[in-house]
Amino acid sequence: MKKLVGFLIILVAVVALLPLAVVFLRPNLIIPKAKAKEELSLPSSHFINWRGAELHYTDEGTGYPVLLVHGFGGSLRNFSKLDDSLRNEYRVLRVDLPGFGLSDFPEMGKHPQYVQMYRDYISFILDTLHLDSVYVVGNSMGGGIAWLAAADHPDKVRKLVLLNSAGYDVSNVSGKLTMFRFKSVGHVFDKGMPVFMSESGLKKCYSDPTKANPDTWVLNNHFTNREGNIQNMLALARSQQFPDTNIIKQVQCPTLVIWGKQDHIIPVEHAKKFKRDIKNCTVLLFDSCGHVPMQERPGATTAALRSFFAE
């Protein structure tokens, strides 16, 4: 009996430690920047230099410009599912935010100000690409950057679309990032992030995890494991820096807020707060949809964008 109990204890210990073994004993998953650029660029890819960093964006279609801004841990590929009809009618520009996708972080100094850096980056994009009149669409953290852009550039941002946007009480999100405040956690990812971690994180963004396509989390994992990206994301998460929510009230342009009702990341109640604080604001709620409506409900999202832009 004692031998059986001892065996069971050892078995439980092995099972408990198996995930750690997978993390620490796995091969190096980090993808060198040059290789990532070669293998993950698109035919519409462009690269520009800003503050010593190489930054990636895509430029497709003709017509009135639409700028798409992804969220934390994502890339411009997050918008790939939007119907081709959007690109057939508009000039669609997608950016990899600094520190994500194929974009580097610029030089930040000893006391980096991440919110201001992203504000400056969007200003740079608007000026460099001559976007003197533009519609801006942002998801999650990218939504927060989008409404900052609308407040900063009321003369340029003519319409704003927020998809499950960051903006208000972020304790639900920041609490999940608490572990990243410890620098020792970063060493767990010295060899990259296993694909099962990307899968687990992305499935939480869907109302129905079975709708998440394996190709999506594999691609996301490649971008996450691009040289430098994990440490950039960890640094951003540790900073716990968030924009001043009072700035939302400065948004003047017509705004469409789209929200998946089953968002497990940012509660749907936040949509009402945007409605309250932005004077010219319409809210559209999607059933059977989580945190990324442009991925889980791409057809409905595209239709809503086209209708709003045509008004």
Task: Give residue spans per PLM region.
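Short glycine-enriched nucleophile-adjacent loop
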Residues: 143-154, 160
